[in-house]
Structure formats: structure tokens, C-alpha cells
Amino acid sequence: MLRWLRAFVLPTAACHDAEPPTRYETLFRALDRNGDGVVDIGELQQGLQSLGIPLGQDAEEKIFTTGDVNKDGKLDFEEFMKYLKDHEKKMKLAFKSLDKNNDGKIEPSEIVQSLQMLGLHISEKQAELILQSIDSDGTMTVDWNEWRDYFLFNPVTDIEEIIRFWKHSTGIDIGDSLTIPDEFTEDEKKSGQWWRQLLAGGVAGAVSRTSTAPLDRLKVMMQVHGSKSMNIFGGFRQMVKEGGIRSLWRGNGTNVIKIAPETAVKFWAYEQYKKLLTEEGQKLGTFERFISGSMAGATAQTFIYPMEVLKTRLAVAKTGQYSGIYGCAKKILKHEGFGAFYKGYIPNLLGIIPYAGIDLAVYELLKSYWLDNFAKDSVNPGVMVLLSCGALSSTCGQLASYPLALVRTRMQAQATVEGAPQLSMVGLFQRIVSKEGVSGLYRGITPNFMKVLPAVGISYVVYENMKQTLGVAQK
């Protein structure tokens, strides 16, 4: 179909200047299915699909947002032609940024080099597969005509936006606080898109955590009490019997409230650490991103850690033990002192490294596997691939850091367990292994894994809807 597009609409011997209006008019007429002189979004969707022209996610909406100058919900010919001319200019700049040797063609080695500068590392073979999806004449290089035809109606405007197909962020929240922060481009920062995306992610996280709160509380109860006899159904039955259905959400308020300060501190710290680790104008590589993200996570955890302790104390509390978040904080301060708000802080910090490291490593592995085996028809992996990769890599990160998370939770709550000795991190590890075996370090991991799929689905749906509500430009 791309060959058809070039032959029918865009001449093969086209110069690098904008196409003559008559060529745009031919394409416009092909899209104007009812012949009324304007193209609405339905006609654009149907027309482009029938022509086999590749589209990015929500491409039609973005084309209309940019091209519909008079905001009447339709594109007339002048708006249509102006959009294509402006878009081709931007795609020309993207093409030149990839064409390192200025020979008018993009080769696999240039793809590898450009992506490395953006912190995305792929092999020459993977670059060839990407080029195959764009290369229409089988030369294993992409010239300007092929590049323009492929991205003609894909509203990406620069190479960074193209690469963000594989940005390790999909707005999912599985309830953990150790993930590396999102990456935002300079354009997103200047336009204010960054805070809208963070807000959308925060709302998605709040809804997701609230929806899966019963499983999260069950996990905490199993971590703290460590009884082999407490299974999932027995745990739920015990919680409902003790405090009713509402008790299943005990501690969720704190878990939701801490999203805002944690996200804000993590984002600010991440930007500062990136500046420290990279020179001005230098792109952030995977290793620098890992270090910056880990340090930002540690900074955010230091700031909001008292809320982590409050969440655990409220989750394991009996009905009427605390009057609320403030009452819980007041009791802890009165009876245990300020230091109690940082119990379990060390294992929590230590857990950041294996979590963030394995999360990134598994994501890169899954990305490479997809590029090697499935990247034949499009450079865009699609929503389901990104969600699956993100969820699986986060789950692997959780699995690696879970023993530290369990010890952290027990240290936070051990003052509330009658007859329990106040042990250090090492002492707790030794006690758990000696009394419960190595499997004791993974107590509660089943409900933790059970909440991953619903958390991913709920947070993604809410995130996408919130982005639309807040006017975040779709990629």
C-alpha cells in the first residue's frame, strides 16, 4: 500500500520540497468519501485504513487537534494541505537527524547509533527489522521518500517521539513505590504535558490501589503474622469477621494519600540526579537512568517513609485501635518516639536496587525479544505488548526484592505484635529462616501477584481516560 501511495499520490521522483497542491488534492478526494469537500474524523479513519497507511496510537485525534485550525471538527482542503506540508517539514528534520553521513539514506548502523544516544540499545539485527517495516523497495536502506510515505499520517514529529514507542512507562500502577520515574521530553516540560501526565498517573494509581486494597491488606497481614495456616480465603474470612467488609480497606487511605508527595519528590529528585550524572546536552543512557531513578526513589522514600509505617500499622490494627491516620501517628510518637517512623528503613532502601535493576533488565530483555521476533510490520509494539512487558518486568522486580519488603513490613509492625522481640534487619532474617524456612521470606506473595493483573488493567484504563480529560496529547 505504501507503493500505491507513492505512485498514486506522491511522485517517486519527488524533490525534497513540498508536493504540488494537485497531489494533495488527489489524496484529499480519496479520503473525502461522501464528496462534501471536507473530511471528518470518521472518513479519515476509514480512508486511511482502506489505503493501508500505518497509523500511530490515536493518530487521527492528534491530526485533527493540529490540523483543524477553525475547530469545526472537519478538515477542509486548505487545512489538510497545510497540515501535510508542516508535518513533512518536521519529518524531514527527523530524517536528517538519523542520516548521520548525509547520504540521503538511513542505514541500520545509523538507527543503532541514534537510539543509543537516546538511551535505547538495540542490535544491528534489530535495527534491520525496524528498517524492514519502512523499507518498501527491499534495499535495506530507507530514503526520504520511503520515510515520508511511512510517517505521512503518523503524527510523530521527531525521532525522540518515534522512539518513545518503547518508553518504559505506560501509566500502570501495581502498588509499589520503587519504580523508576517517567521520562519527559523538553517539549512536554515546556508545554505543561508533564504535570498532566503525572496527575493522570496519580489518579490512576489511587483508583487502582483502592480497587485492589483488600489483596494488599491481606498481603501485609500474611507478612506480619507469618502463619503457615493463614491462607487467602482464611485471611479474608478472619479480617471480615474481626472488622466487617470495610476493614478490608484499612490502611488504604494512607496508601493513596502518599502518592502525591512521593511522585512530586521522586520527579524533582530524578531531574536533579540526571543533571548531576550527565553533561549538558548529553542523552541519558540506561545505566544513568537506573542510577538516577534509584537515587530518586531513595530520596522520595526518605521523605514519605513515615506514611509507609502508618499504612502498615493501620493495616494490621484491630477495630477501634486507632481513630485514624492522625490518631495512629500520635500514638506512635507518644509511646515509641520519632524513630519508630523509620523502622524498616534500611531494608526498604536496599530493596530499591534489585527491584529497579531487575525491572529495567527484564524490560530490556522483553523489548529485545519482541524486536527480534515480531517487529516485522510496524515500529510500534502496541498497547498490549507495552502493558505486558511493563507488568512482567515489575513483577520480576517484586519477586527479587520481596524478602527485603517482608522484613521491612515486619520491622514496621513488630511493636504491635504481642510477645514479638524487637529485632534488627539481620536478626529478623535469621529468625524467619530458622522458624519458617526460606519460604517464610515469601509469605504473602500470592495475594501480591494476584493484584497485578487487575491493578494493571484498572490503572491503564483510568490513566488513558484521565489523559483525555486533562487534554494530554496522544502519542
From Swiss-Prot:
Q: What is this protein called?
A: Mitochondrial adenyl nucleotide antiporter SLC25A24
Q: How does it sit in the membrane?
A: Multi-pass membrane protein
Q: Which residues lie on this side of the membrane: Mitochondrial intermembrane?
A: 1-197, 271-293, 364-386, 464-475
Transmembrane residue ranges: 198-215, 251-270, 294-307, 344-363, 387-404, 444-463
Q: Which residues does the UniProt record annotate as the domain EF-hand?
A: 19-54, 55-88, 86-121, 122-157
Q: Where are the Solcar repeats?
A: 192-276, 284-369, 381-469
Q: Which residues bind Ca(2+) 2?
A: 68, 70, 72, 74, 79
Which Pfam family would be a valid example here? EF-hand_7
**Organism of derivation:** Mus musculus (Mouse)
Q: Which residues carry this modification: N6-acetyllysine?
A: 318, 334, 435
Q: Which residues carry this modification: N6-succinyllysine?
A: 318, 435
Q: Where is this region: Linker region?
A: 159-168
Q: Which InterPro entries match?
A: EF-hand-dom_pair, EF_Hand_1_Ca_BS, EF_hand_dom, GDC-like, Mit_carrier, Mitochondrial_sb/sol_carrier, Mt_carrier_dom_sf
Keyword Protease in record: no
Per UniProt, the keywords (alphabetical) are:
Acetylation, Antiport, Calcium, Membrane, Metal-binding, Mitochondrion, Mitochondrion inner membrane, Repeat, Transmembrane, Transmembrane helix, Transport
Catalysed reactions, semicolon-separated: Mg(2+)(out) + phosphate(in) + ATP(out) = Mg(2+)(in) + phosphate(out) + ATP(in); ADP(out) + phosphate(in) + H(+)(out) = ADP(in) + phosphate(out) + H(+)(in); AMP(out) + phosphate(in) = AMP(in) + phosphate(out); phosphate(in) + ATP(out) + 2 H(+)(out) = phosphate(out) + ATP(in) + 2 H(+)(in)
The free-text domain remark for this protein reads: The regulatory N-terminal domain/NTD formed of two pairs of fused calcium-binding EF-hands, binds calcium in the mitochondrial intermembrane space and regulates the antiporter activity of the transmembrane domain/TMD. In absence of calcium, the apo form of the N-terminal domain is intrinsically disordered and binds to the transmembrane domain, inhibiting the transporter activity. Binding of calcium leads to a major conformational change and abolishes the interaction with the transmembrane domain and the inhibition of the transporter activity. The C-terminal mitochondrial carrier domain/transmembrane domain/TMD bears the transmembrane transporter activity.
Q: How is the quaternary structure described?
A: Monomer.
Which residues are listed for Ca(2+) 4 binding in this entry?
Answer: 135, 137, 139, 141, 146
Q: Name one GO molecular function term.
A: calcium ion binding
